[in-house]
């Protein structure tokens, strides 16, 4: 077993926001559905897609699982 430590300021890269939105749409999910799976309010998730706030590392891990992508795909495209 190995652990990858990811340190990155997501708010500095609008590419993350676009990748998150694209990945969600590719998964066929709405913002409301993703928010429900993450147990956050829809506006919280929408703020991530709009670059107003950023998910913490635990939420990023859950996003990757829900959207079936790796963190590198979300961050770097």
Describe these PLM feature segments.
Residues 39-55, 77:
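Recognition helix of helix-turn-helix/homeodomain-like DNA-binding domains
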Residues 18-37:
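Short basic helix-loop element that most often maps to the first helix and adjoining turn
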Residues 1-15:
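A detector for short, charged/polar N-terminal pre-domain segments
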Residues 20, 34-35, 45-48, 74:
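Conserved hydrophobic/aromatic packing and binding residues within compact polymer-binding modules
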Residues 14, 25-26, 40, 54:
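Short amphipathic helical patch at the helix-1/turn junction of helix-turn-helix
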Residues 39, 58-73:
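DNA major-groove recognition helix of helix-turn-helix/homeodomain DNA-binding modules
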Residues 19, 30, 56-59, 70:
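Residues that mark the N-terminal boundary/hinge immediately upstream of a DNA-recognition element
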